[in-house]
A protein has these predicted regions:
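Conserved acidic donor-binding segment of nucleotide-sugar-dependent glycosyltransferases
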Residues: 329-330, 334-341, 350-355
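Nucleotide-sugar donor phosphate/pyrophosphate-binding loop at the beta->alpha transition
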Residues: 121-123, 131-154, 171, 198
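Aromatic "clamp/platform" in nucleotide-sugar-dependent glycosyltransferases that forms part
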Residues: 297
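Short hydrophobic beta-strand element within catalytic cores of glycosyltransferases
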Residues: 314-317
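Nucleotide-activated donor-binding/catalytic signature segment of Leloir-type glycosyltransferases, i.e.
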Residues: 256-276
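A short, well-ordered alpha-helix in the C-terminal region of glycosyltransferases
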Residues: 350, 357-372, 381
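Short alpha-helical donor nucleotide-sugar binding micro-motif in glycosyltransferases
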Residues: 156, 275-276, 283-289
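Carbohydrate-associated surface elements
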Residues: 41, 168, 189
Length: 392
């Protein structure tokens, strides 16, 4: 089947959606589908940054053809990325089906217009975030309400199939007025990371003196990082050797995080590592962390939690979005309310002081939770959806 995947960004741009699309594209290509990825030249949107010139704008990666089109956007809270020439690129691909990712983006409207004219089915993976969880102030939130009601809802209605990653995501879409077409529940999968080099440790490489709490993800406003800092402070007083390690590209919050670190007097107790491209070092960080924390305001799924669990690391995560559908509270980790620094502290102290608990939760996550989520299973389900919407 001739398939086109349309995400806003694609690796080496960091992010969960980016990895998601890469994993399904490479596996679909391995199954002899003709796969193209039409994406932008963006490394990140907030702050706006393009990929370096060394990243080819047209190439073949893992059997999938990747074209990176020029992106542009309005400034500030009017931010809304556009693909330059996406309609023409779709026409040139002559696809049998288009799979577009992230509902609140211009590529959905362009894909719908192309699909209408070419009589081609299209499916949408929403990667939905409710209005209250997105970055920006009141103007951006008002614009998002207008977009959802007047523009996005009619677009979603016309998709041949809407793919959600959790039942909670489906519920939120319905609650926010989206007239859903056929819906398929397809949670993402986990792909084993490259193992660390023998004899190399994350702590030694970066000079981290003792046990550490780990966060991996974009430094963005919806990730709950300020409550994490506040919740970590009592642990740092309880254990003077404890460090909080934050790995991830700046999503607009780094300056605020640095200010809050200073206000809380945490200084060298928090390490801002930025984005680490070497997967082996990130794998080592997951492996060595005493606990992984994802205190987000919202996550459609929370793929990074699977990565932590796969390394046998217990997790603390917000009881939001799709997270409670796969992280069992008290079995693989602890679920807490979002935006609750005291709950972060309580969960950290519970896990920090109990090696047997860490071992038990880590073992359950690695041996019981993670095997339920594989990318091959995801692609099996996608192929079923694709065949049904394309028809005989």
């Amino acid at each position: 089947m001739q398939l086109v995947q349309v995400p806003t960004r694609y690796p080496p741009a960091p992010g969960g959606v980016e990895r998601h699309v890469q994993e399904i594209a490479r596996r679909l290509a391995k199954r002899q589908h003709r796969v193209s990825v039409l994406t932008t030249d963006l490394y990140r949107e907030i702050p706006w940054e393009r990929l370096p010139p060394s990243v080819p704008r047209s190439t073949t990666e893992d059997g999938a053809r990747v074209r990176r089109l020029r992106a542009f956007s309005f400034p500030g809270e009017l931010h809304y990325p556009f693909f330059r020439g996406l309609g023409r690129a779709l026409k040139a691909e002559s696809p049998e089906l288009v799979h577009v990712h992230t509902y609140g983006t211009n590529q959905v409207a362009v894909t719908r217009r192309f699909a209408r004219r070419a009589h081609v089915p299209w499916v949408l993976t929403a990667h939905y975030h409710p209005i209250w969880s997105i970055w920006g102030g009141s103007l951006r939130h008002r614009l998002r309400r207008f977009y959802d009601a007047r523009l996005a809802a009619p677009l979603v209605r016309e998709a041949s199939c809407l793919i959600v990653q959790s039942r909670e995501e489906e519920r939120l879409l319905k609650e926010n007025g989206f007239p859903l077409p056929r819906v398929a529940l397809i949670p993402p999968g986990y792909s084993p990371m490259r193992a660390p080099d023998p004899g190399t440790t994350f702590a030694q490489t970066f000079g981290i003196p003792g046990p550490f709490v780990l966060f991996v993800g974009r430094l963005a406003s919806n990730k709950g990082l300020l409550p994490l800092l506040e919740g970590f402070r009592p642990l740092s007083q309880h254990d003077p050797t404890a460090t909080l390690v934050l790995i991830g590209a700046d999503g607009g919050m780094r300056a605020a995080i640095e200010r809050r670190i200073g206000e809380l007097g945490l200084g060298s107790r928090v390490r801002l590592m930025g984005y680490i491209e070497d997967e082996r070092l990130v794998s080592a960080a997951f492996q060595e962390a005493r606990v992984f924390v994802l205190p987000s305001e919202y996550e459609a799924f929370g793929l990074v939690l699977l990565e932590a669990l796969a390394h046998g690391t217990p997790v603390i995560a917000s009881r939001v979005g799709g997270i409670p559908e796969f992280v069992e509270d008290g079995r693989a980790g602890r679920l807490i309310p979002p935006e609750d620094a005291a709950a972060v502290t309580s969960a950290l102290l519970e896990i920090w002081n109990d090696p047997a608990l860490r071992e038990r939760w880590g073992h359950y996550g690695r041996e019981t939770t993670v095997p339920r989520y594989t990318w091959d299973r995801v692609v099996d389900q996608l192929e079923t959806v694709y065949r049904e919407v394309v028809g005989p």
